[in-house]
Amino acid sequence: MKSENYIRLNEFIKSHDNIKKAVIFIDKNFPKPVVFIFYSMLAFLALKKDKRVFVCAAIPWIDFYLVTKLRNKINRKRPFESIGFEPVLMHTKGKSCPSRHASSSVIITFAVYFISPFFGIITGIISFFVCFSRVLTGVHYISDVIAGMAISVFIGTATFFGILQKK
């Protein structure tokens, strides 16, 4: 998306109060059910003494760690910094790519789906809104979100539906 499109999108959202409130609500609140479902699944596995609890906790943690290291190294400016507009939602500067919200929500979706396809689909739908909201708030470029998602799709596919599926 071109710079002027980010500015227009940002101005449109900020000039429509209900849309702005909805975008902020999604950005602030939709990660919560993803985390709740994930932790509930881990607790369920732990209570059942299911050894899958370890990989279902470790793989998202490893993904989070790798994405954090990569974004620290890249240290890409956020759209509001490089283009020069006030975002819908204020955020710290730098470390925009890859999006950790996008990456985390996608890898959690893989972990949840690995245990329960039903809850995995629900988590996936919620994660879509989490990812989309990061662009709408002006804190990520589309490419930041796609990069975060791609990393987690690769790691999730390779582990949950590759290595672990063969065991």
Predicted region positions:
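Transmembrane alpha-helical segments of multi-pass membrane transport proteins and ion-pumping complexes
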Residues: 64-68, 72, 153-160
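Small-polar-interrupted transmembrane alpha-helices in polytopic inner-membrane proteins
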Residues: 58-71, 121-133
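Transmembrane helix-loop junctions in multipass membrane proteins, especially transporters and channels
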Residues: 47-48, 72-80, 138-143, 164-165
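Interfacial segments of alpha-helical transmembrane regions
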Residues: 40-66, 119
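Membrane-embedded catalytic cores of phosphoryl/pyrophosphoryl-handling enzymes
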Residues: 84-167
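Membrane-helix interface segments
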Residues: 17-19, 33, 49-52, 116-122, ...
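N-terminal transmembrane-helix/juxtamembrane module of multi-pass inner/ER membrane proteins
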Residues: 1-36, 67-94
